[in-house]
Curated annotation (Swiss-Prot):
The keyword Chloroplast applies. Residues 1-232 are annotated as: Alpha N-terminal domain (alpha-NTD). Keywords: Chloroplast, DNA-directed RNA polymerase, Nucleotidyltransferase, Plastid, Transcription, Transferase. GO terms for biological process: DNA-templated transcription. One of its GO terms (molecular function) is protein dimerization activity. In plastids the minimal PEP RNA polymerase catalytic core is composed of four subunits: alpha, beta, beta', and beta''. When a (nuclear-encoded) sigma factor is associated with the core the holoenzyme is formed, which can initiate transcription. Residues 246-318 are annotated as: Alpha C-terminal domain (alpha-CTD). It comes from Chlorokybus atmophyticus (Soil alga). Its EC number is 2.7.7.6. DNA-dependent RNA polymerase catalyzes the transcription of DNA into RNA using the four ribonucleoside triphosphates as substrates. NCBIfam families: PRK05182.2-2, PRK05182.2-5, rpoA. This is DNA-directed RNA polymerase subunit alpha. Belongs to the RNA polymerase alpha chain family. Gene3D superfamilies: 5' to 3' exonuclease, C-terminal subdomain, DNA-directed RNA polymerase, insert domain, RNA polymerase, RBP11-like subunit.
């Protein structure tokens, strides 16, 4: 019984759940695919999901009186390095592409959480309960920070820091909204040995859900390949232009050939470059007593002296 062939693959979400505010999960099926396409499709989606989707995060911090990340703050339990690591984990979402500033000012004793961050209206917190620090004494913790939008993972820009004020502390930024991607390829899809399917599992940090991540990835992939639909035909110019017709009347003697190669061409009634143009590289080898070395002499002579390239394959004769 012949199986009905589906025109193209579709993407279907077969499982979706929110495990926590910062952990969204989804499982998707892409099918049907031709045998061998699954691993290609899976790899493309994995790379785009992890590397091409934008996210927002804190990329630098200013804390009054702190000049480097190995400092401590009186009355604050965490060292500055630990505070920076906690700020690095704060998950934000925004529709703006602009670099923005926020600040924090908390009087102790207090537990400092993400909800204490004072952010521009265009930036939202995914998990207001994310922990930042504990102020154990009657002191205040103050800071200003920068929020940027980007892709992938970005190491602290220490070169850029040289242009900052002394107390600006850069943070290695993890912009990726997708935290993990797995995929498997299953053959014999629908009982058809010529088809397979891809199952993709996606985990996100909650700034977008898994369905949004897949949708954004599809758009990225389409935008990458759609310009390639407009393939332009490039009309190849003839090997020798009309204005160069005089060039074709050059005698083979002027190609600086060996006596053996020259005599073979003469015996084959090849007297000018014009005569040579009716031969391919393979055709030359069929001339009596004309070996590969002689053919290479002719090819090199045409290229160096006249800029003419003989085609490699044998001409088809009607």
């Amino acid at each position: 019984m012949a199986h009905q062939r589906i025109v193209g693959p579709t993407i279907e979400c077969i499982e979706s759940r929110i495990e926590s505010r910062r952990n969204h999960y989804g499982r998707f099926v892409i099918a049907p695919l031709e045998i061998g396409q699954g691993i290609t499709v899976g790899n493309v989606f994995r790379r785009v999901l992890l590397g091409d989707l934008e996210g927002a995060c804190i990329t630098s911090v200013q804390i009054p009186g702190v000049n480097h990340e190995f400092s401590t703050i009186h009355g604050v339990r965490e060292a500055v390095l630990d505070i920076l690591l906690n700020l690095k984990e704060i998950v934000l979402k925004t529709q703006s592409q602009e670099t923005q500033r926020g600040h924090l000012s908390v009087q102790g004793p207090s537990t400092v959480l993400a909800r204490d961050l004072q952010l521009p209206s265009s930036i939202e917190l995914v998990d207001p309960d994310q922990y930042i620090a504990t102020i154990s004494g009657r002191v205040s913790l103050n800071m200003e920070f920068t929020v940027e939008v980007g892709k992938g993972y970005q190491l602290p820009d220490y070169e850029k820091k040289k242009t900052f004020q002394v107390d600006v502390l850069p943070i290695d930024a993890v912009f990726m909204p997708v935290t993990k991607v797995n995929y498997t390829v299953e053959e014999n899809y629908g009982g058809d040995r010529s088809q397979e399917r891809v199952i993709i599992e996606v985990w996100t940090n909650g700034s977008i859900n898994s369905r949004q991540a897949i949708d954004l990835s599809v758009n990225k992939i389409i935008n990458l390949f759609s310009p390639l639909q407009n393939v332009r035909s490039i009309e190849h110019e003839p090997l020798v232009k009309e204005k160069d017709s005089k060039m074709t009347e050059v005698l083979v003697e002027e190609l600086d050939l060996s006596v053996r190669a020259y005599n073979c061409l003469k015996r084959a009634q090849i007297h000018t470059v014009s005569d040579l143009l009716s031969y391919s590289q393979e055709d030359l080898l069929e001339i009596k007593n004309f070996g590969r070395r002689s053919a290479e002499e002719v090819i090199e002579g045409l290229q160096k002296r006249l800029g003419i390239h003989l085609p490699k394959e044998k001409f088809t004769k009607d």
